[in-house]
Every structure is written in C-alpha cells, then in structure tokens.
C-alpha cells in the first residue's frame, strides 16, 4: 500500500465521506450515496443548440423550435445532467455557501467537458470562462460556483494522463476574470426566456483590457445550471462583440 493510499484510508475512517445531497455516509467515497445516485439523470436527446431535451428538434437542421425562435449568440450548448432530485439538492447546498461542494461536484462535469472541448475543436490557445457573479453576490457567497466547478474538472483532466493524451491540441486556459457582471440582477424563479433576457440585458461586459485575451479564440462558457439560456446568451454576446471566434456553453445541469 502506498503512503497516499494509507493517508486517504485513515482520513476516510476519521472523517467518512458523505452524500452531497442527503449527508448519508458513503464508505466508498462516492459523491452520492446508493439511495441518491439512481436519481441522477444524464442529459440525453438534447437539442445541440440550447441543450433542452425536446422531441421537436430537427436532426437535419440541428435546432429545436426554441432555438429557431431565439437567435442565441452562442453556437451550441450542452449539459451533463438534468437538473433535479439529488443533483438539485447538492447544487442548492453549494449555492448556500458550501464551497467544498463545488469542488466535489466538479468531477461530474469531466465527461461533458471533454466532449465539449473535443467537439468544439478547442486547444491551448482557447479559453474557458465561468459565468461571473456580481461583486456583491460574490462577497456574500465567498466564491463563484461556476469557477470552482470547472476548475475542479480541469484539474482532474490535467492529472489524468489518459485524458491529457485525448487532448492533442492541449487544454484551453481558464480565464477567471475575463468577464464581469456589471450590475446585480433579480432572481426570476420560473420566469420565461423573454423576462429573463430583459432582466440580464446589458448586465455583462469584458474586464478592462481583456479583449486581447479573447479575440479570435474559441470560448467555452461554463455555468452550474442552464435554465432558459438568457444569462449564457448575454455573456456570449459580450464575448462575441469583443472578437471571440465562437462561444460554446457548458453547464453541469439543465433545467427541463
């Protein structure tokens, strides 16, 4: 047994891992317990334009009815899971100040992140940008959950040789302060796309002198939850206006 394995085993005995959703003990160190894991729903059959699982998206045209009605500024969107049940509980806990939860959920993003980077043709010259919080919200929460999620996922990829080899063009650079939220926006609950888009209009901009770091580059915009696409669309608009080559969106979960 290696020293690392011995240390990890000892820590597990002293402080056993607990389910991210319900706090039950998970002796094998998994993120969710045996009772909560079955509730996780991998997102399948989703529209490549907005990541919404819909029966009306046309495989030939590649977009659903929503995407054809709304001219999103991002070129595609994907999510790892449907938002609900145990994952929703864990995300809510994360947003209520549990920073360690963001780091723990990060590995769930790895497969979808690898897929997004490969399909989008990303390389070392491109950038990953987390959706920013407003400065006031960041002070209240103490961290940006989107940043913590994608940072943990990228760290997992960088530490796994097989995953690094699968990215021959290299991993894109994480830009944590490239985009900023210029004003606070209201929580809109179950509001529809039109109301959400009106609320976030003009709420995002590039940081001063940041345009050079995005111009002619592919951008992967990452958030914890994709709801209607309004926030991602506004962020993508600011990035495209600064000269980004294109913007792809990735979320841990998609509200359906």
Predicted regions and their residues:
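Glycine-rich phosphate/pyrophosphate-handling loop used in enzymes and phosphotransfer proteins
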Residues: 1-256
